[in-house]
Amino acid sequence: NAGAIQPQWQSPVVGDKVRFGPAPFPYQLIRAIDPGRTLVLGSAPGESRTPASWVFHLEPVAGGTRLIVRSRNGYPPGIGQTIVWRVMTDPIFFVMERRMLIGIRDRAEAYAAALAAVPRGA
């Protein structure tokens, strides 16, 4: 997670890699994008043994914007895989995703406050 909005990351295109940490951390590819509204990430060929997607969607609501996040994972069959993924990995992912969303909220609110502080016409 970045601590601030990074200008160099504001023009993503389909096919770009979104890495989950510094290399060699795994990554997903941008599969679809509607700028300013929706970003769809998906498993990269050879990068993951299970198909997965992660969608970020902005929905205007009264007085602001709601960020809707959905993820889907194709877990391998078997009791051992179920224990590893659903019992161990999913709760860890929940905590990490929640921290990421809180960071996004904090940066968005700080950015909105900074914009509001700029005099009109400046």
Locate predicted features.
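Short terminal or interdomain "cap/linker" segment that borders an active site or interface and mediates
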Residues: 121
